[in-house]
Structure formats: C-alpha cells, structure tokens
C-alpha cells in the first residue's frame, strides 16, 4: 500500500505530519510509522489495565497520545486523549475505561495492520 492511500483506512493527517515534523520526507515518516509496530507501550498499557493499575494506564496512554500526535494519527490521538482525560479527572467507572480501551484496541490493531502493508517510500 502507498502512504497516500492510508487515509482511506485510518484517521491520519499525513500532510501536516510531513510538513510540520518530518521535513516532507516520506521515507523518514514511514520509518517512524513502522516504529509503532515494535513499541511495547500499548502492550504494557493493556497489562496495567488488566491489573487495575490505572496510574500506569495513564502513563502509557499519555505516551501513546504524544506519539500518535507526532505521527498525525488523529483518530488514535483523540482516543488516547479521552483515556488520559478520564483518568486525570478521577471521575470514571471501570466499565467506562474498559469500553474506551476496547475501542482504542480495535483502532490500534487496524492501524498497525495497515502500517505493516506500507511500501517503503
């Protein structure tokens, strides 16, 4: 799959990411997108959630929110931001958090699947 096809499947702002953060280098941008395939933060966030360690969930969700913002992954950025806001507010139920984590998991997995299919720039 070509980079320019990615927005058909994933909420992503390629133009802004390329212009603002990757000096219009598609090769560098794709290289950084592919780094998502090897990050442990998402797995660690899931493990923390399973253990009920919401402070760790906050930490990893915040990290992932920043990474997604840098990469222009607007959909995932928004979902991680929602998790961060909910945890910071302290006004949440475990089922609310679990619902948000299930939603972000689906988008995370789908996004990684499409990133795996990217051709080198």
Residue ranges and their predicted role:
Residues 1-59, 63-121:
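Two-component system phosphorelay core
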């Amino acid at each position: 799959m070509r980079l320019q096809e990615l927005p058909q499947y994933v909420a992503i702002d390629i133009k802004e990411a390329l212009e603002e953060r990757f000096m219009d280098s598609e090769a560098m941008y794709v290289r950084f997108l592919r780094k998502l395939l090897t990050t442990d933060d998402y797995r660690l966030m899931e493990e923390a959630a399973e253990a009920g360690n919401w402070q760790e969930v906050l930490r990893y969700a915040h990290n992932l929110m920043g990474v997604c913002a840098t990469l222009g992954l607007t959909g995932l950025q928004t979902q991680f931001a929602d998790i961060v806001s909910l945890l910071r507010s302290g006004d949440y139920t475990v089922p609310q958090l679990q619902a948000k984590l299930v939603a972000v998991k689906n988008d995370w997995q789908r996004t990684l699947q499409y990133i795996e299919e990217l051709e080198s720039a």
